[in-house]
């Protein structure tokens, strides 16, 4: 039977498996890419605030 244009096709078990695998890969990338990048950005902000607000040394 022909597939109508407006109707989405039914998801097969193979499609479901591929989608599940893609979601796992996305979760893995979050822990390996996003979190370290976020940590570096936060560290840079902390260092900048520390340098900007430290008292000037008078000698």
Curated annotation (Swiss-Prot):
It comes from the Eukaryota. The chain crosses the membrane at residues 32-52. Disulfide bonds: none annotated. It is a single-pass membrane protein. Residues 9-27 have a biased composition (Basic and acidic residues). Its main location: membrane. One of its GO terms (cellular component) is membrane. Residues 1-27 are annotated as: Disordered. It is found in: Membrane. Keywords: Coiled coil, Membrane, Transmembrane, Transmembrane helix. Residues 9-31 form a coiled coil. Belongs to the SMCO4 family. This is Single-pass membrane and coiled-coil domain-containing protein 4. It comes from Bos taurus (Bovine).
